[in-house]
Amino acid sequence: MKHVNKILAGLITCCVILLLSGCSPRQGEKHDFSIGKGTFLLDGKPFVIKAAEIHYTRIPAEYWQHRIQMCKALGMNTICIYAFWNIHEQKPGEFDFKGQNDIAAFCRLAQKEGMYIMLRPGPYVCSEWEMGGLPWWLLKKEDIKLRTNDPYFLERTKLFMNEIGKQLADLQVTRGGNIIMVQVENEYGAYATDKAYIANIRDAVKAAGFTDVPLFQCDWSSTFQLNGLDDLVWTINFGTGANIDAQFKKLKEARPDAPLMCSEFWSGWFDHWGRKHETRDAGVMVSGIKDMLDRHISFSLYMAHGGTTFGHWGGANSPAYSAMCSSYDYDAPISEAGWATPKYYKLRELLTQYADSGQVIPDVPAAYPLIEIPAFTVGEVAPLFDNLPAPQASKEIKPMEQFDQGWGTILYRTTLPAVKEGTTLLIDEVHDWAQVFADGKLLGRLDRRRGENTVVLPALAAGTRLDILVEAMGRVNFDVAIHDRKGITDKVELISDTGRQELEDWQVYSFPVDYAFVQDKKYAAGDKLDGPAYYRTTFELDEVGDVFLDMQTWGKGMVWVNAVSYTHLT
């Protein structure tokens, strides 16, 4: 069963929530958080932020409380989070803040556990996340300029920010909540220099109701002054192994009386498909945090717990396109599965020595129980080409966004003229992984990661059906390449010794990442097929617990369990 686009659907249930009593900030109690000379002030007293970055989108909601408790037991006093625009507004004007997307519920859980919140609402977040958190449908406007004063981009950003304000503005510490700081944009100096744009985003954040707590902007030590606004707190991002004094040298010169903070201290690094797992030395990480604490420098550990980038939400790097994998373990102190690692205990030992006055660091919460499910086989199959959705006609090739599709797979179909053996099929460009079929026979695969865009064809008769099946693997999340449209972005040509011919008159079929779409297929008993297909099975559990699904013998595709898209296989 090593074919592509195989999809497993199963039946499984989820778990329990561990409970641990919390401390201040207590819900309903109002506080003041402000900027003092060389320090942050909480109710007028010096306060060092020790933040753990975790993402509500990368942790099942049933586990939120446990992971927050793990951060508190690590010795942290704050949780740092992004707000991911594209998961909350998957279609223009349709906002979702329920269930897994209930960011306010996540913040309230943190407050229940005695943790403050640093909020980073973007609009751009990077985070190895699809398009850096920006919604795909922005790319339907062909001339849009993302992260600029483009009128449409600003209009949509303000609408989103207002919705975030409706959810979270009343959770500022001055109003009885636990939000102590709010970020404006994200590492913009790595993208452009445009203080007017940053000012517009700042104003959008304020207009959304975030007027009570300090606003800050983060960047690298080499770029923080490019877009620095006088009324914002400036913070620096860097990682394990950095020289602390060198990182803050320019900031201290520019603002000698300002509090210092590393808003992203990278505990590890992210992983790409096809590469080795990244790690960073625990001792070096702990040493860097000690250096900051000895200097009364606040920090946010990115990541304290990375979790999993479920479904299609992983991003990619460019140039030399490289997609992020589903695991966002990040070599963080808390593993992807939520377990305390040796790095966790080494850092906990340090932070215990730097506990806040009156802070009681609780015991480390127990991990969720593991269960084992006996091996099972796939019982039903539905061939993809026998289960096509209704097509859309298009004279020319267009990317999937122009067919109102954001993610998943798209099929471009046309008929060929007579083709001589050795003719080259040129696809410009494949975003991101394609299979080429002639009358259902696989002729080749193309991988954007390897710069592949041609298939040499055998002799083919006029009227042969050409199918190009393209899978989107994640939009670029960093730098100017975030304008990353999917499918085939330009044209398809036949190149032979007699010249070039652009292919036209396409039938286009969209396969969204949607369980209702996957479920509604003509399944029949069977195991493996030659070609792309949907696969389905069911199994029963005698007990619930964490379990790992081993897909090593499978190929490319996605997995759904109880209608939830858990992982992207590549």
In which residue ranges do the predicted regions lie?
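N-terminal carbohydrate-binding accessory modules
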Residues: 23-78
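Aromatic-lined substrate-binding rim segments of carbohydrate-active enzymes
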Residues: 66-129
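Aromatic- and acidic-residue-enriched segments that line the glycan-binding/catalytic groove
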Residues: 93-99, 123-147, 198, 233-234, ...
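Active-site neighborhood of glycoside hydrolase catalytic domains
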Residues: 156-226
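Substrate-binding cleft/loops of secretory-pathway carbohydrate-active enzymes
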Residues: 190-207, 220-250, 310-315
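Catalytic-core region of carbohydrate-active enzymes that cleave or remodel glycosidic bonds
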Residues: 241-333, 339
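Aromatic-lined ligand-binding clefts that engage carbohydrates, nucleic acids, or primary amines
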Residues: 422-437, 539-562
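Conserved small/polar residues in nucleotide/adenosyl-binding loops
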Residues: 567-570
